[in-house]
Regions:
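Feature captures the catalytic ectodomains and active-site-proximal regions of enzymes
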Residues: 1-235
Length: 235
């Protein structure tokens, strides 16, 4: 709501509060991260490698209906709150929880950890054929579907599932056309990369920098994409 205000004083105060909150949170992570990643630590937030274990696995058997997991890469919490307003006529939010990414937060490490349910070093040790080192050529996340399958098997979930990655408009339209097939699966995971690509373009392309000159404009641009996206149609 504050983004609608034209009071520069309020905006400056909010900016200072956000900066201070960022600094406090950074110090909090620095103090606690090494203990969070220990296997025997019980007092920790949900992290990348425990996300599916904590939030998805318990729900697989909750219903006869298929479970859909939608991952929008690089989506910030404030962007999610913008999207949520469009979804409220169709969905009821039961829980609005936050999970923490492992470090580093780059896709190669954090997203592989989500689907494997393991820390990167453990992925490399257990599944070397599914791990691409940083210095190696090639896509670093090309085996997410296979890693998801391995994690499901470790939890004894021998179910029919699908993994779908949407990188462009054509892939999104194709996925929308396959919805009747997806409804036959117990679990469907859908990864959308647009927001991540937009984030990178914001730093690399001048025209995107102009369109997303500040946080309000950036949220507006992302919201416009979502409103006209195949993802919104699917949901």
């Amino acid at each position: 709501e504050l983004q609608k205000s034209n009071d520069e004083g309020i905006k400056e105060v909010l900016s200072m509060q956000k900066l201070e909150a960022d600094n406090v949170f950074s110090r909090y992570v620095e103090r606690n991260y090494t203990s969070w990643v220990q296997p025997d630590c019980d007092d920790k937030p949900t992290l990348s490698h425990t996300l599916i274990r904590d939030k998805v696995i318990p729900r697989i058997d909750d219903s006869d209906k298929p479970l859909f997991v939608i991952l929008i890469d690089n989506l910030r919490y404030d962007q999610w709150k913008s999207i949520q307003t469009l979804l409220e006529p169709y969905f009821r939010t039961e829980n609005d929880d936050i999970y923490y990414s492992i470090l580093p937060t780059t896709t190669q490490y954090a997203r592989n950890s989500i689907f494997a349910g393991l820390m990167p070093l453990e992925i490399r040790r257990r599944y070397p054929k599914y791990w691409v080192d940083e210095e190696d050529e090639g896509t670093k996340n090309q085996y997410e579907g296979e890693l998801l399958g391995e994690q499901l098997r470790r939890f004894g979930k021998n179910i029919r599932y699908s993994y779908n990655k949407v990188l462009n408009l054509a892939a999104g339209k194709k996925l929308a056309e396959q919805m009747s097939d997806l409804m036959q699966n117990k679990l469907n995971v859908i990864v959308y990369n647009f927001v991540d690509m937009l984030s990178h373009a914001r730093t690399e392309m001048e025209i995107i920098r102009e369109l997303a000159a500040d946080e309000q404009a950036y949220r507006s641009l992302m919201l416009s994409w979502f409103e006209h996206s195949s993802l919104f149609d699917i949901m």
